[in-house]
Structures are given as C-alpha cells and as structure tokens.
C-alpha cells in the first residue's frame, strides 16, 4: 500500500511530529549533568515509538538535533554524537525487528563520517519496513529545508530543465524533506515552550499544534493519549467552512 493512500481515521493522526524539548532543564532541576537528561530522553523516544506501534500511527517525526544545536557547548554536542552511535548499534536492530523504517532528514554532512555511516546503514537495513516510518531530524532547520528546495529549483531553471513559470507550491513541496509522506497531522512540543523553533516550517501549515509543560524525559503514554484525545475533539478545516467540511464527509482531508 502506498503511504499516501492509507485510509484516514479523522480521530487518529497518521503522522505525528514532536520537538523533544526539556532534557537539559529536566536534569539541571535534579542537579544532574545535562547528559543524564539526554539519556532519559532516548528512553522517552522509545516509549513514544512503542505507543505509535500500539495505536497504529504510521508516521513519527522527531526533532533530534537542530541546525542551531551545533552552537551548544562542545562537550554536550560530543556526548550527543557518541550516544547516537551507541544507540544505532543497539537500538536499530530492535526497531528493524519490530517493523520500523528509520529515516534521517537534515544536513548530515556536518556529522562525523562514522555517524553518517551508521545513519546510512540504518536506513538501508530498515528500508522495506512499513509498520511505522520513524524520521529523525538531525542538523535540521525549516528555513534551511526551504532554502535547499529553492536552490534545487533554481539549478533546474539555470540548466534549462525548468521554466520559472512552472514553479508552484506543489513543485517546491516535492523538494522538501518528507516530500513522499503526508504532512504531519499533529505537532507536539514538550517542556512548556510555545514555539515551533524552525521545525518543519513548510510541512506544518495545517497541522494541529499541541503543547505540554511535561519535560521530554517524563513524556509517556498517558501524556500522548491526552494529546490524541485533544486531537480527536478538533475539527480540521484546511481553510474550508463547516458546510464544506460536512459535505466532504469524514476522512477526506488533503494527503
């Protein structure tokens, strides 16, 4: 089954995107190193994967490392890189066994070559899995995403493969990250911060936003269910009127 033809249950999001925020502050409030928070954050991410598999949610996109995170203290960045390599060594096989496809979006060329090799191996190993598509945004920024898409189209115009008047939203969208997936139905951010922080700026134009004060290391199935209950109570309009939504019937929303 092609991913864009998955039937839509209007009370259950197909695709959830999450900013996993609050690891460092969670640790600092407990007088622990920020690295302790990041370790706990990995466990929260795995709990979230478990929840999506249990509920039948087909796509999960996690903001793991932003393009701005390179400006954090060097020891914290180095720890995150080392932890990522260890995670790929232990966790990817388990994700593969459970039918999870792993993808990475972002500027991976900035990472150490060993980490890039782990990313590539993880993608190849899990490429045929369809139970859950897990996209990890690493060294990613929404503005960067749009810039790269615009640059690709500009190169096509310069090469004579494309006319400027042929460029529209659909064509630009085809060059964005996650272009082969439906846009996120629901966006979640933890830690009480109410910002989207340069995450999936293009992709979340009509996404339902949900914020919680819970720090990411404490994020669990109870909080996720609260988010889903809230989502189920909302009416997604996509710019339409109540009458237009009613005439379309349940489940007929843009892919």
Swiss-Prot record:
Binding site for Mg(2+): 21, 208
Details of cofactor binding: Binds 2 magnesium ions per subunit.
Keyword vocabulary terms for this entry: Cell shape, Cell wall biogenesis/degradation, Magnesium, Metal-binding, Peptidoglycan synthesis, Transferase
EC number: 2.5.1.31
Main EC class the enzyme belongs to: transferase
UniProt keyword Metal-binding present: yes
Pfam families xref list: Prenyltransf
Cofactor requirement: Mg(2+)
Residues holding substrate: 22-26, 34, 38, 66-68, 70, 72, 189, 195-197
InterPro entries: UPP_synth-like (IPR001441), UPP_synth-like_CS (IPR018520), UPP_synth-like_sf (IPR036424)
Catalytic activity: 8 isopentenyl diphosphate + (2E,6E)-farnesyl diphosphate = di-trans,octa-cis-undecaprenyl diphosphate + 8 diphosphate
Keyword match Magnesium: yes
Positions annotated as active site in the UniProt record: 21, 69
GO biological-process terms attached to the record: cell wall organization; peptidoglycan biosynthetic process; polyprenol biosynthetic process; regulation of cell shape
GO cellular component: a single term: cytosol
Single GO term (MF): ditrans,polycis-undecaprenyl-diphosphate synthase [(2E,6E)-farnesyl-diphosphate specific] activity
Family indicated by similarity: Belongs to the UPP synthase family.
Alphabetized NCBIfam families for the sequence: uppS (TIGR00055)
Subunit annotation: Homodimer.
Biological function: Catalyzes the sequential condensation of isopentenyl diphosphate (IPP) with (2E,6E)-farnesyl diphosphate (E,E-FPP) to yield (2Z,6Z,10Z,14Z,18Z,22Z,26Z,30Z,34E,38E)-undecaprenyl diphosphate (di-trans,octa-cis-UPP). UPP is the precursor of glycosyl carrier lipid in the biosynthesis of bacterial cell wall polysaccharide components such as peptidoglycan and lipopolysaccharide.
Protein name in UniProt: Ditrans,polycis-undecaprenyl-diphosphate synthase ((2E,6E)-farnesyl-diphosphate specific)
Organism: Xylella fastidiosa (strain Temecula1 / ATCC 700964)
Gene name of this polypeptide: uppS
